[in-house]
Regions:
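Strand-loop microenvironment adjacent to phosphate/nucleotide-handling motifs in alpha/beta enzyme folds
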Residues: 1-241
């Protein structure tokens, strides 16, 4: 009898993702404690040839949500796409391969020192912080062994804070389902210095309405949307090439 190996593989992947998510729950801060406010610079539309980045962050429920978002994004999106999914060492390579297979997009685990390209999707490596630098006219990924921040490594706040030092015209931020408030402080600080557009997943479609709630409570969201509508919003702001 021939077994359905694809179904077995999908089930194994799902079990791995659930295991990885359970590992980070205990280290995630409660979003209800969030009370900081930011003096945000209003978002402004920029030309299509501007320097852009898309950053998507997620925690609990993220792998499934990421598949939905990436499935709706074009292969020729006009920016590198950085993904921070809370996962420990050893899980993010499998997630990147799964997302690549399911969506047909160029998804990979970020490597230290690599140049970031438009239309490429980079997943932060589990057990490492991902930072972005600009070097000789290009954006590059830097993997860091700095201590966990708020119990998280990778941590979206660390990535967003690295962008404070980068010359960039626009950062499109999407905050998806997850416990805690990772991403809020980093985006908040970035919004005071850079041109950002912030999208949060709504409560109804979130597995855990923690991270999206925190960013919206901080008063720096441009849109709060059902999960299925987030890809079109990202594409509308970012454009294609």
């Amino acid at each position: 009898m021939i077994k359905n190996t694809k179904k077995i593989s999908d089930n194994n992947d799902s079990a791995l993702m659930r295991s990885a998510e359970s590992d980070i729950i205990e280290n995630t801060e409660d979003s209800k404690s969030f009370s900081v406010s930011y003096e945000r610079i209003p978002h402004k539309k920029v030309p299509s040839d501007s320097r852009k980045l898309v950053v998507i962050c997620a925690s609990t429920g993220g792998p499934k949500a990421l598949q939905t978002v990436l499935t709706g994004l074009p292969f020729n999106i006009n920016a590198p796409v950085i993904i921070v999914q809370h996962m420990p060492t050893g899980f993010t390579a499998s997630l990147a391969n799964r997302l690549k297979a399911k969506t047909g997009l160029r998804v990979k685990e970020a490597e230290d020192g690599e140049k970031l390209e438009k239309g490429q999707f980079y997943l932060a490596k589990g057990g490492k912080h991902l930072k972005i630098v600009r070097y000789r006219g290009s954006y590059k990924a830097v993997l860091s062994d700095d201590l966990p921040k708020n119990g998280l490594k990778p941590c979206a706040d660390v990535l967003f804070e690295s962008l404070l030092k980068v010359d960039i015209d626009e950062v499109v931020c999407a905050v998806l389902t997850g416990m805690g408030k990772d991403g809020t402080d980093g985006i908040g600080k970035l919004s005071e210095k850079k041109n950002v557009y912030v999208i949060a997943q709504d409560e109804k479609t979130s597995t855990v309405y923690g991270m999206p709630h925190a960013i919206d409570a901080a008063g720096i969201t441009d849109e709060v949307l059902p999960l299925e509508e987030i890809p079109k919003a990202i594409e509308r702001v970012t454009g294609t090439f």
